[in-house]
């Protein structure tokens, strides 16, 4: 089994567990690359995105040294918490995807919790 297949299997395993515990809560989905990090609050029942944020946004891009460090992830976590709260979402289910809960993913999650999201 190659790296791509194992990554996809890991992501599917995580999402399967999320579906079991989610209930009516939307999903806070994280995607990271070597240069940026992206996050969305997704309502799977309706099939649409409630809020989104990434390190590619112009107002953040100037203030961050790079989009690929824990400081950038923390800034995105605070921003998504602010946007989700503004949209009326307080509780979410954290979807780390195929990524381990460490480093940038952990920094984003902790900042989102500090910003007011509950998961």
From Swiss-Prot:
Keyword Ribonucleoprotein: yes
GO CC annotation: cytosolic large ribosomal subunit
Pfam families: Ribosomal_L18p
GO molecular-function terms, A-Z: 5S rRNA binding; structural constituent of ribosome
Keyword annotations of the record: Ribonucleoprotein, Ribosomal protein, RNA-binding, rRNA-binding
Any single GO BP term: translation
Disulfide linkage: none
Subunit (UniProt): Part of the 50S ribosomal subunit; part of the 5S rRNA/L5/L18/L25 subcomplex. Contacts the 5S and 23S rRNAs.
Role, per record: This is one of the proteins that bind and probably mediate the attachment of the 5S RNA into the large ribosomal subunit, where it forms part of the central protuberance.
Family classification: Belongs to the universal ribosomal protein uL18 family.
HAMAP family assigned: Ribosomal_uL18_B
Protein name: Large ribosomal subunit protein uL18
Organism the protein comes from: Mesorhizobium japonicum (strain LMG 29417 / CECT 9101 / MAFF 303099) (Mesorhizobium loti (strain MAFF 303099))
Lineage: Bacteria, Pseudomonadati, Pseudomonadota, Alphaproteobacteria, Hyphomicrobiales
């Amino acid at each position: 089994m190659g790296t791509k297949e194992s990554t996809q299997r890991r992501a599917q395993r995580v999402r399967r567990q999320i579906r079991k515990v989610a209930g009516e809560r939307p999903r806070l989905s994280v995607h990271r690359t070597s240069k940026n990090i992206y996050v969305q609050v997704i309502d799977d029942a309706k099939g649409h995105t409630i809020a989104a944020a990434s390190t590619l946004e112009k107002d953040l891009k100037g203030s961050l040294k790079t989009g690929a460090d824990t400081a950038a992830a923390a800034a995105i976590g605070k921003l998504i918490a602010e946007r989700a709260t503004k949209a009326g979402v307080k509780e979410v289910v954290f979807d780390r995807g195929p990524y381990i809960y460490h480093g940038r993913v952990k920094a984003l999650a902790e900042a989102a919790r500090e910003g007011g999201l509950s998961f």
